[in-house]
């Protein structure tokens, strides 16, 4: 894999990084690329947050922990100070790589080391800066060619070197180069093997990562959209809160005015009640005078009615006395009528006996005739307008009595006399 690291504002790419690659190895590769010595620290930055990586930490593992935000994380190589001994050495004139070369691979030892071999990782305390002394080293120094270096130093220091020593040095270098070529061939074969083995998985991983990047972009867009919406809603909420405060202030003012109005209303109601009571007192006085006048008038009318009732009582007593006298006279007349009726019947009977010379049987008169005659007598004395009308001295006899007075005989005798 490739790891992007920012060095002095320039982005550099470190190739061949795996999950077991440590920060120390990445820093060594970058220090060799820029050709500078000193104390270096690898920093993991996300937005405004920075974290110093320890030398034994794995940058790939640390980036994977960020998940969908891994693309926003930056790795920065920062020089924190000079080396322990800034001395010019024979290697200080080593070739400094050009600034245009931005790709630097890890040392071959880091590639050839087995993934399972973690015993050689240094156990250093976290957040410890890395210190490198000396200039940039070559491949022979990386492979630990101490003998060749010492031999070359002897050759350079000894100006009287012989041709045999030079040939010996050439043969030694040729052997080393052949060994390196063989090692490179084996490494290339291994690389081809792993490329063939993981080409499909790498393509799938690339596709998956591209899809993930797209999803991350969509999520970022959605997040930006919702952040904008949140800001809009917050502004609206702030405006609504301001409006609410204004409304509350207005409500408070209205409540104060309402209290003043209620006090005025209570005062006016008290005045109206007092005025109403005054009017009611005046009206009660006027009504009392009117009632007194009406009472006097009613008393006068009651006196008149009392006098009239006395007169009526006296009249009623006189009428009752007259009625008693008339009733007594009527009873006397009825008794006289009964006596006359009996005498008349006897006279008629004697006349009938004398005319016919026969013996007859006298039947008693029917009671209905006597009751009818009494009813006729009672109806002749009505009362009109509360005054008694006394009957006159002359009184007509019933029609049946007039018939009996005539001595004429008839075929039908109403008195019930049969031969």
UniProtKB/Swiss-Prot annotation:
Biased composition (Polar residues): 382-399
Domain Ras-associating: from-to ranges: 1-82
Pfam families documented for this protein: RASSF8-10_RA
SUPFAM superfamilies: Ubiquitin-like (SSF54236)
PTM annotation (Phosphothreonine): residues: 131
Keywords on record: Phosphoprotein
The name this protein goes by in its record: Ras association domain-containing protein 8
Lineage, top ranks: Eukaryota, Metazoa, Chordata, Craniata, Vertebrata
